Design a protein with these regions (language model features):
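Binding-site signature for planar aromatic cofactors or substrates
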Residues: 3, 9-218
């Protein structure tokens, strides 16, 4: 099973790690997996000759024999479709987030901050290249994101689907390390946290998501 970790490292040590103070560390791997599955549109980072490449992709997050598997596909012309095999790709899951106003704090000697949840997943990639396996990948993706579309997809002409699949490169990443962080005002007083939750709950978008996660902390 991939390990879940957080590191408070000195500068120059473990530079590939996400900075995570202990009170913000997610130590439960299943909690991290559930977050990744809920917020599955992520950012994949690879490095080639010291230069990072980045693509934003929807992922299928699954577990197989106690291993976390991340599955997605690139446009075939995307250079990352080949770069992913070199080194250790990083996939970043980073929603929701919210601005936190100091008006919610008891002391006037306070400054704004940002609450968020983020999971960084590292692993080893393999390509999914055969038409049969790519078809399976696409059906799995449709099943997760819009199951009602499966019937229409199945009815599409075979040559049309084959041409579509020629334009993509599927891949899966077997995760060997997870770094997970939830910065949800754990370092504030209970009254301040409740005031932040009330403030965020009255807003829209990702603020409500952070409020819900904060309310779930006990």
């Amino acid at each position: 099973m991939g390990r879940t970790s957080g590191v408070e490292a000195d500068a120059g040590k473990h530079i590939n790690y996400m900075y995570t103070p202990k009170q913000f560390l997610i130590t439960d791997q299943q909690e991290a997996v559930s977050f990744m599955q809920r917020y599955s549109f992520a950012t994949i980072v690879t490095v080639n000759d010291g230069v990072p490449s980045v693509t934003h992709l929807p992922f299928i997050v699954s577990q197989r024999d106690d291993k976390i598997i991340l599955t997605s596909h690139f446009a075939k012309v995307n250079p990352q479709a080949t770069e992913i095999l070199s080194g250790k790709p990083l996939v970043i899951f980073a929603e929701p987030h919210a601005y936190i106003s100091p008006k919610n704090y008891e002391s006037v000697n306070s400054v704004p901050t940002w609450n968020y949840i983020a999971v960084h997943a590292y692993g080893t990639a393999t390509l999914i290249e055969s038409p049969e396996k790519k078809a399976g990948l696409l059906e799995q993706t449709i099943q997760f994101y819009e199951a009602d579309y499966l019937k229409q997809w199945s009815a599409l002409p075979a040559d049309f689907k084959l041409n579509m699949m020629k334009g993509i490169t599927g891949f899966e990443i077997m995760v060997d390390e997870i770094q997970a962080k939830k910065k949800l005002s754990q370092n504030r007083t209970e009254q301040e946290r409740q005031d932040v939750i009330a403030d965020l709950s009255a807003k829209f978008g990702t603020e409500k998501g952070i409020a819900a996660y904060m309310a779930g902390l006990r």
